[in-house]
Amino acid sequence: IVPTYSARSGTGGPVATADLDRLISELLERVESESNIDGVYLSLHGAMAGESEDDPEGKVLEGIRRHVGDVPLMASMDLHGIITDKLIEGIDAISFLHTYPHIDAYETGERAAINLLKMLDGEIKNPTTGRVQIPMLARGNELITRTGKFGEAIRACQSIETSEGGIAAGVNIGNPFTDV
């Protein structure tokens, strides 16, 4: 296990191009400085946007995948993250937060790490990542995960995760402040 990079920020609009370029290049330099990488785990929020890059996480995944090749690549992600084509193409599986308000970050990271270990052990073979986009808008007060339709959708995803062949499932609502 080789920790490579950690960055954190609050909501604040698009990241300046120079700052985003530096962040991505520093992260990729650290990954590229390692050889014989067996697998990768990323803890992402998923709703970052830059002044000149709408999909920073996808760009990071492209760079990591280019370096590590065909090794298991697992992520955990906030349910406010935006699932892009680049993200789906670059990742093997994603474990999503299942709570809003967010109280399951530790458990989500644990699920992702366990799934990565199962991929490395050969217990999970050839995972497939997909996305179904549902044309809907929901008010914030309807997104509490303990109750209501959103909570029912989360519980359906948890059922998928524990079913035979299920690895990870989630409902992502995106981020209303990231207009991409």
Which role fits each region the language model picked out?
Residues 120-148:
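Internal, active-site/partner-interface "lid" segment
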Residues 42-45, 129, 177:
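Core alpha/beta catalytic barrel or barrel-like domain that forms the active/cofactor pocket
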Residues 141-180:
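Hard-cation-handling environments
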Residues 102-108, 130-139, 169-175:
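Active-site catalytic microenvironments in core metabolic enzymes, especially phosphate/sugar-handling
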Residues 92-96, 132-136, 180:
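Short acidic (Asp/Glu) and glycine-rich catalytic loops that position anionic groups and cofactors
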Residues 17-24, 32-119:
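Active-site histidine-anchored catalytic micro-motif
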Residues 9-13, 45-50, 101, 133-142:
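Active-site-proximal beta-alpha loop/turn segments in soluble metabolic enzymes
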Residues 1-30:
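N-terminal glycine-rich anion-binding loop in soluble enzyme alpha/beta folds
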